[in-house]
Amino acid sequence: PLIAQFSDEDLVVGGGVAIFHIASQRVVICSAPDRRGEKYYFLPKGRRDAGEDSRTGAEREGYEESGYRNRLLPLPTKHRQPQAHPRVDSPPLTAEPVWMQMMPLGYGSKQYVLYWYIAETLPPGLEVELETEVGAAYKPPPAYPHSLTLRDRVKMEPEGYEPLHHEGTGVDEEEATYESHLVSVEEAIKKLGRTGVMADVVLKGWKEIQHRFAME
């Protein structure tokens, strides 16, 4: 733990997501060439827009960088946030961040604070509702329904369904070079680097998805 203070002009807040396709037990990772032309892998992330909710910002960045629409997935993760009043006996499922990462931004005193969330790809019906033209303003999806179990969620897709991938969702020249891949959890961890925070986000997300299945 640390104590630190940053003024508004030196602080940038962002969010990232591990986007799971639950039915096929796969997760979305992105890739891009580094300065040496070699491919590296990462989870989609970025700064939230001014006035934007942090969770919505994470979903939007996930969509823009990967091309996969997504929504945060409520899971039985451990966290330190208090429950809303009146409190219930059993802790509810929440979509709280599973990791917080702090990084210097450029040179000087600027600080980047990044929250990592767990999300899922959208069912076919929502993809139709949210369809927009390339370059149009981002349209956020509705939240995951409280009463929808994961098993019933999986049944919303026909067997062998492939989540819809959207082209041209990047908002600048750099993001236009990004490629996305829907891979197994093990392959994602290997490509992200087993000791890095992004691999741990994937691991924790998949563990809690399995935990929720067991609870239901």
Residue ranges of predicted features:
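Short, P/G- and charge-enriched loop/turn segments at secondary-structure junctions
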Residues: 1-7, 94-107, 166-169
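Conserved beta-strand and immediately adjacent loop positions that scaffold enzyme active sites
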Residues: 16, 26, 179
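Conserved Nudix-box catalytic region and its N-terminal flanking loop in Nudix hydrolases
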Residues: 23-87
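Nudix hydrolase/Nudix homology domain
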Residues: 36-40, 110, 114-116, 120-216
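Acidic pyrophosphate-coordinating catalytic loop
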Residues: 79-113, 124-125
